[in-house]
Amino acid sequence: MGSMAYLTFMTGGGALTAVVVQYLRHQPLSDIYRLPVRVIVAGFFGVALYTVMLAVAFGLAPSTDIGQINLLNYLWPVWMVVLGIIFLGNRPKVILVITGILMGLFGVLISRGFGLLTHPPLNILPPALATIGGFLWALYIVLLRKWKIPEEKGGTAFHFAVCAIIAGLTAVYLKEWQSIPPWSGPMIFWIVVGAVGPVGIAFSWYEISVKNGPVFLIASLSYFIPIGSSLLIGLFFKETMNKGLIFGAILITFGAWLVRSASQEKIGNTP
């Protein structure tokens, strides 16, 4: 199954899962689509377009570069800190923040291997898409916090429904619907896992937490995701596994600790 066809099913199922989450939390279902215009616009770029860009980046990148594309995407906690300073008025200790950010960037650079300068990527489009997409996602999250959007006005279902439409139309353009393999148990399993877990439930809960919790702490904790995801990618894409991949993920995590140490935001703060 092509990447856009799979993304259509995954994000469409994720949107339906987010509706179920809204219902189980006893929140009005009408709030799913009655969103402020600015949230709809920001979510188009920060959720729908970001997800499509990341999928395209993974699809275009050679297997040896998958790990680096993944870590470039996970620079969004860095962008959250920078954008938090700009839009939220946070004033962390600048030297520690810069040190943490540089460690994260260096971690990404070496994640492809220690021969980056002698063997640069042949195609810069995948890393560019992953980097820009991660920035758009971070901007969306910070703007939600700045605008103090009510918790019940969750845009996850709406934005992923839009994403499913974009992915579906892209799959039409790429003629992926004409080459879908016969349905099988493993295919259905991965669609359901992707839709219910990382898209439907995880995004819904993350959006709720970032509206109410300390954005610097959330950004810092998010840094621990790269280690787990890098291990999984190394498991499924053995060509991308190298000493630099795990070391780079560890550097990003340590950079997160520095950024968190630099933050002057208290854990109990709410908007």
Task: Outline where the language-model segments fall.
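Hydrophobic alpha-helical transmembrane segments of multi-pass integral membrane proteins
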Residues: 3-23, 37-41, 96-106, 125-132, ...
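Membrane-interface helix termini and inter-helical loops of multi-pass transporters
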Residues: 1, 29, 58-62, 111-123, ...
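Specific transmembrane alpha-helical segments of multi-pass solute transporters/efflux pumps
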Residues: 26-67, 110, 195-213
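Hydrophobic/small/kink-forming positions within alpha-helical transmembrane segments
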Residues: 19, 43-48, 52, 77-82, ...
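Hydrophobic core positions of alpha-helical segments in small-molecule transporters
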Residues: 9-10, 42, 72-75, 99, ...
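Specific alpha-helical transmembrane segments that line the substrate/conduction pathway
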Residues: 5-16, 54-91, 215-235
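Hydrophobic transmembrane alpha-helices of multi-pass small-molecule transport proteins
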Residues: 18, 92-115, 223, 232, ...
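Intrinsic disorder in cytosolic terminal tails and internal cytosolic loops
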Residues: 263-271
